[in-house]
Every structure is written in C-alpha cells, then in structure tokens.
C-alpha cells in the first residue's frame, strides 16, 4: 500500500471537503498496453530485462485487474476491456478505505469511474450497480 495515495485522498476529502473523485482511464493507454504485454510474456515464459523497472512496478499494481481478461483469444475489444478493467479495479480499491466507503454510503462523496475514447471523443461512465460502461450524455 502506498501511504502517499491514502494521505492525498484523506486530505482532499476530510480537509478540503472534496465531494467527487474521478477515476479516469483512456483509450490506447500505454501503461495498460505494457501491462498486457508483460502478462503475455509471463504466460510464454519470456523473462525480459526491463529498462523501466519503476514504470513496470507502477503498472504491475493493476495486474489483478486483468485476471478475467482472456488473452488467448484475439478479441478486438481486448484493449478496451483491459483499460476499463483497470479503471474498475482502481475504483474498487478506493472503496477499501473505510472512511471513503463510509462517505460514499452517507452520500457526502461520489466516486466516478470514467473511460475516455480519444478517437470518437466519447466519455463513458461506470453504470450504476454494474461493472459495464455506458456513454455519458452532455
């Protein structure tokens, strides 16, 4: 657990009175692509030296998010599904902070999970009560 993340969240919500937290992901995310590549290399038994060990350590935090993604099938949506899975993973991780979960249940805080498709210029949000994403209306 990274204490600085919790401290920043605690300061924002408890001291500054932030009412909304947005977990934002986006299409063609290099971090998620690197994580997917790392998972495929692990499956194939390829151990590669990584000149970006700090970046790898950072993206590896989200590795559990991709446990339900089937990388063995060449699915056209695998990139989008992986990116959105990481957003949901981060969203759910926020709710592991008891004081954040409590603030959400008291309706004094809202946590949003969004995913942006740069190409279509569409913003998607986590559907309430579901792990699916729906387009946002403006």
Residue ranges: model-predicted function:
Residues 1-20, 31-138:
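Divalent-metal-activated hydrolytic enzyme cores
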């Amino acid at each position: 657990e990274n204490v600085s993340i919790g401290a920043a969240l605690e300061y924002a919500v408890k001291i500054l009175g932030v009412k909304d937290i947005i977990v934002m992901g986006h299409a063609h995310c290099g971090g998620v692509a690197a994580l997917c590549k790392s998972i495929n290399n692990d499956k194939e038994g390829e151990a590669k030296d990584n000149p970006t060990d700090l970046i790898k350590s950072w993206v590896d935090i989200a590795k559990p998010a991709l446990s339900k993604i089937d990388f063995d099938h060449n699915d056209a949506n695998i990139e989008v599904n992986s990116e959105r899975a990481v957003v949901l993973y981060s969203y759910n991780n926020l709710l592991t902070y008891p004081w954040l979960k409590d603030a959400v249940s008291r309706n004094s805080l809202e946590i949003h999970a969004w995913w942006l498709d740069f190409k279509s210029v569409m913003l998607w949000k986590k559907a309430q009560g579901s792990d699916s994403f729906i387009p946002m209306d403006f």
